[in-house]
Amino acid sequence: FVIETHLRILDSDLIKVLKQAGLKAVKVGVESFDADVLKASGRFSVSKDQQLEKIRELENNNIQVSAMYILGFPTDNEETINNTINYSKKLNTTYAQFSVWTPYPGTPVFNEYKDKIIVNNYDEFDQYNLVYKHNLFNKEHIRKYLSKAYSSYYLRINWLFKYFKSFITS
């Protein structure tokens, strides 16, 4: 089975119990490299050292890790986005998912940003389109960052080696 959780919840004992119960993969929200970006968005994270330690512990227990990252937070800039992309490669999880920060209708964040919403079609609220007026980026900028994130992550020799190794051993 697969779970989606926050790294702060996982400890060695829980990882062992989940592994014994048949856990094969974990999805975790790393979201951003930048603690200030996370804090400004009302999010939190464990330290970078703890992230790396817990991810390696999962992998050492033959549990695949998918890390999820968000680009285009309201306080993101070119440096914070590039740092997040580079950090994803440092963590080198089995999979990485990159998405665009999206204030969903019906949420408090949507109400906070309703005057900045730039699309009328709710089909575009898909985490791959910038749906609000960002102070620095437009839709094309964010799409380029998403493309850069995916291509620079999945076209690395470190990731290809890890993927084929896990494919062969599974």
Where are these regions (language model features)?
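Glutamate identity and glutamate-enriched acidic tracts
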Residues: E4, E31, E53, E57-E59, ...
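C-terminal accessory regions of radical SAM enzymes
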Residues: Q64, E79-N82, N86-F98, T102-S170
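Conserved strand-to-helix beginnings and helix N-cap segments that scaffold or border functional pockets
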Residues: S12-I15, N77-N82
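Conserved SAM/AdoMet-binding glycine-rich loop
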Residues: F1-S66, L71
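Short, small-residue-enriched loops and turns at beta-alpha junctions
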Residues: G72-D76
